[in-house]
Amino acid sequence: MTTLVERNKAIALRFAQDGWGTNPNWQTTWDELMNADVVYHFNSAAEPIIGLAANKTFNKSLFQGFPDIRQTMEDIVAEGDKVVYRTTIQGTHTGEFLGTPPTGKSVKVNDFTLLRIADDKIAEWWYECNLLEVMQQLGLVSA
């Protein structure tokens, strides 16, 4: 029998792998793993993104900017109803990203994702990456 922490970790790993925005079936994975009213806190934004449909729309727009982006899992830790993982992401900016036209430049940064899981579904999540570093690597702001 698996423990709650083991189940939650498995959900997080599936989300990180199959729910990654360049995976052709990521939206199906999100349907299976997320609550319909999931709450997403993106990079310390003042207001969260609420609801599965809104989360999908936002995620789709992010991955249009870096259609070849890939991630490497570095660490994963779970306790109780929470799982946090750190990945290295890298890709080429060939589409619009957060209102910025394509630069053709590559980026490589670390990011963190924290998931709160309730009843085997992602109920809330936080994502943090250094967007200043991304913009510097794209040549949009000076170092």
Can you annotate each of these PLM segments?
Residues M1-A143:
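C-terminal and inter-domain tail/linker signature
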